[in-house]
């Protein structure tokens, strides 16, 4: 019975050879952890905004900043290993290609960089900017997840599924976004 299923699935029966690498075990889980940490930073920033009795800067300093530091480190490692994978295994001609998925993963990372820099140099900008910037990494992490999972909506070198012959899926970007 199992052989019948694999015969019917054709190209889907085996993992793409480009994905059969040790970096596949490391890179995607690191980015998933990175996105999760970005969402945690956003939740702490929202708690700081919505908490009437506590100082927002104190909440950010005690809760969001340590998570942002870990998220920055994990994101740097995840994005860096993705670049190494692209250069060595995938032979895409470089570490970075400005692919929609790569760019989407860079956005929450840049937000964390800005957030941490504003935390290091307090007083240069009003504190509300730091709090507002703390909200952005989670939103961009959700956006990056959507871009990564929306295979076919944005042309991407990260599209490892599909054989290009499926006629039942709409080619309209709006319809594909609604399918998400």
Positions of PLM-derived features:
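Alpha-helical transmembrane segments of multi-pass membrane proteins
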Residues: 78, 144-145
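Juxtamembrane membrane-water interface segments of multi-pass membrane proteins
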Residues: 41-69, 81-97, 112-137, 147-163
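Short aromatic-rich membrane-water interface segments that cap or initiate transmembrane helices
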Residues: 13-33, 93-107, 158-179
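Hydrophobic alpha-helical transmembrane segments of polytopic
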Residues: 34-37, 67-75, 104-111, 130-141, ...
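Short, small-residue-biased leader/transition segments that mark boundaries at the very start
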Residues: 1-6
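Core mixed alpha/beta domains of very large multi-subunit molecular machines
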Residues: 21, 29, 35-37, 41, ...
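Internal, non-catalytic "lid/hinge" segments that mediate substrate recognition, gating
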Residues: 8-11
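Catalytic cores of phosphodiester-bond-cleaving enzymes
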Residues: 33, 46, 50, 74-77
């Amino acid at each position: 019975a199992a052989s019948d299923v694999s015969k019917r699935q054709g190209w889907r029966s085996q993992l793409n050879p480009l994905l059969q690498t040790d970096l596949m075990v490391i890179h995607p889980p690191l980015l998933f952890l990175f996105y999760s940490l970005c969402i945690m930073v956003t939740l702490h920033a929202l708690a700081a905004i919505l908490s009437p009795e506590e100082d927002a800067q104190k909440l950010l300093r005690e809760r969001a900043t340590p998570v942002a530091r870990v998220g920055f480190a994990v994101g740097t490692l995840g994005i860096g290993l993705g670049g190494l994978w692209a250069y060595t295994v995938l032979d895409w001609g470089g570490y970075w290609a400005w692919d929609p998925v790569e760019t989407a993963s860079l956005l929450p990372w840049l937000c964390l960089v800005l957030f941490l820099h504003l935390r290091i140099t307090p007083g240069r900008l009003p504190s509300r900017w730091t709090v507002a910037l703390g909200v952005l990494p989670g939103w961009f992490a959700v956006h990056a997840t959507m871009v990564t999972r929306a295979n076919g909506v944005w042309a991407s070198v990260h599209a490892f599924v599909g054989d290009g012959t499926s006629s039942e899926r709409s080619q309209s970007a709006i319809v594909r976004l609604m399918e998400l």
